[in-house]
Structure formats: C-alpha cells, structure tokens
Swiss-Prot record:
InterPro entries tied to this protein: DXP_reductoisomerase, DXP_reductoisomerase_C, DXP_reductoisomerase_N, DXPR_C, DXPR_C_sf, NAD(P)-bd_dom_sf
Record flagged with keyword Phosphoprotein: no
EC number: 1.1.1.267
Reaction equation(s) it catalyzes: 2-C-methyl-D-erythritol 4-phosphate + NADP(+) = 1-deoxy-D-xylulose 5-phosphate + NADPH + H(+)
Gene Ontology process terms (BP): isopentenyl diphosphate biosynthetic process, methylerythritol 4-phosphate pathway involved in terpenoid biosynthetic process
Molecular-function annotations in GO: 1-deoxy-D-xylulose-5-phosphate reductoisomerase activity; manganese ion binding; NADPH binding
Keywords assigned by UniProt, alphabetized: Isoprene biosynthesis, Manganese, Metal-binding, NADP, Oxidoreductase
Annotated protein name in UniProt: 1-deoxy-D-xylulose 5-phosphate reductoisomerase
Reported cofactor(s): Mg(2+); Mn(2+)
One Pfam family hit: DXPR_C
Described function: Catalyzes the NADPH-dependent rearrangement and reduction of 1-deoxy-D-xylulose-5-phosphate (DXP) to 2-C-methyl-D-erythritol 4-phosphate (MEP).
Amino acid sequence: MNEIKKKQIAILGSTGSIGTQALQVIEEHPELYEVYALTANNKVDLLIAQARKFMPEAVVIANEEKYAQLKEALSDLPVKVYAGAAALCQIVESGPIDVVLTAMVGYAGLKPTMNAIRAGKAIALANKETLVVAGELINQLARQYRTPILPVDSEHSAVFQCLAGEVGNPIEKVILTASGGPFRTCTMEQLKTVTKVQALKHPNWEMGAKITIDSASMMNKGFEVIEAKWLFGVQPGQIEVVVHPQSVIHSMVQFEDGAIKAQLGMPDMRLPIQYAFSYPDRINSSFDRLDFSKCTNLTFEQPDTKRFRNLALAYESMYRGGNMPCIVNAANEVVVAAFLRDEISFLGMSDVIEHTMGQVSFVQTPTYDDYVATDAEARRIARELICK
C-alpha cells in the first residue's frame, strides 16, 4: 500500500491565535501534515517551544534582535534559523512547501503572500489585510501563477463551502454574519468611555488582541466585506452584513432563485483551518459538535453603522476603490495600536481613520509601489492626527 505523501505546511505567524490553532490541527493529523517552516514576529520563547515540538526544516524570527536567542536555543537541533523580513519572504519559496498559511497580522503579510503565490504555493489565507490592501493585485498574481487561495476566515470559509457545487449558478447576495462584538447593545454614550479591557473580551471567539479590537469596532467585518469582494468576484452591493450574536451560522449565500445556503458549526477556528488544509476533502476531527437542542434562539439584526462607523468607512473605501482600502487599513493599524496604549478613545479611532481617508493621496489604479507609499503616508498622517 502506497504511503500518503504528507502535505508540507509553512505557517507565517505560528505564535499567534490562528498559528497555534493550526498547529493543533497538524498535531491531530500527523499522518497527513508536516510542519516545514514556522515564523514569528517577536514571541521567540513560544517559537522555540514550537520548533522543539514540531521539528520544522526552518524557523524565521522577523525581529532580528531575537535571532541570537533563537539560534542558541535551537543549536542542538537540525533546524535552520533565519531572521528578518527578507528571510520571511524567501522561506515561503522553499521547494517542498505545499501550503502556506498566512496567519500574520496586518499589512506585513502582503509581501510574503505575494512571494508564496509567485512560487506556486497554495495559500491558506488568514491574513485578510492582504486582500484589503491589494486585492486586485493578489487576484492577478493568483490567476497568473494558477495558485489557489483558500479562505481561513470562518465567514469566507463558510461562503466557500456554500459555493461548492454551484459553478455557473449566479450569486445574488453574499451574507456575512457578525457577532456584533462585546459592545453590540451599548449606546453612543456608553461607547465614549469603553476601555481596552472591555474591548478585548469577545463574547464568542478566541482571537489575538488586534483582531479582537477590530471585531469590537466592526472594522474586522468591514475588512471581511472587502475580502469577500475579491475572493468571490461579487460587487460591493451584493455583500450584506447581518448581526447574528450566537455565531452559529458562519455565513450564507443567496442565489438568483432566492434559495439561501448557510454553513453552521461551533465557533472554532480550527474547523476552517482544517478545511483549508484538507480541501477538497473533509477529514475527521475531535472538535466539539453543534448541539441543536441548545440552539434554541438564533437571532438576526441589522448592523448600526452610526454607532459602528468603521463598517461604513470600510464600505466607502470599497466603493471608492483604488488605494482607499489600503489607506483605511494603515490608519486602522495605527489607531488600534494607539487604543491598546490608551492614547485614543474607542470612538476616536473612527475619527482618525475618516480624516486620514481625506488627506492621503488617492491613486485609482495602484501598483505594488503605490501600496507601499500609501501605507507609509497613511500611517504618518494617522499618527499626526492622534498626536493633535
């Protein structure tokens, strides 16, 4: 009997929430998957522990100041150790790699994702900012190099699964569900005084700090709307957001005959991660199952874009196109970092993003170099606005 060739996986951002859960998936299926490379930004101690456990071919620490510590700690293992942004971009091109999981946070994921696509690697996309910033460019590259992009976000994985078997059937609407976050029922007055401690308590999902704040402000859902446009080839007007506090229905697709397909499951990121790894197959898992006897109250409501302006700003950037989503992403990364340092209020984040949108040079048909310049300019302006 022929032995199944194990898929070689590279995880960009292995020490974050998605990365650690991806390693749980791999650990559950050692007969199918093998870790080829692990990368991290700063969490060197966790990266060391992961390397010792999973014995990858190589590890990369983006922060070059941590290189010596990493190198010394792994000196007794046959693991290659690299550091820096350039190494991050090069490691994804390694011949044996089959799948690159892009689980890095923010704009930093763009360049390595582009390199992985050019190298013909299947992309398990968890870094939504890549498509927010440069969706058109990424799609062009994916077509050129015939590289599959498999969504890892639970919502986009849900849509992806709903579209299985529907080739040629026109989509009328993509319906992305949102939990509404921890402040769903808060008044504008209450939102003025919310703290980072409150914002970091998501009701349903275990996530990293940045995406948890984005979920609280609904910018995460705005980014997911933009991501859906590029992943599924739909127009902005075909993407609807519905608040579904229980997070049981992960998203839906409505077809031209009015029929709606939905994907349901437990709010567990390991499920979409595993599907991205195993696609087009489904494989067994030990993860919790949905108990319908406990799903006695599934509710839906419209998002309030007056209280959660970030969702409206994301839609506006998508309609305007060009480098505008890149501007919004850069400004958002700056304001979220400032909010986590207690330098800006929760509602103040939207003000800075909106003003940044009005001040950065607009480019209708941006190149990669335009995105780089836009990101730098938007960050500078957002920081200046925070300091005023």
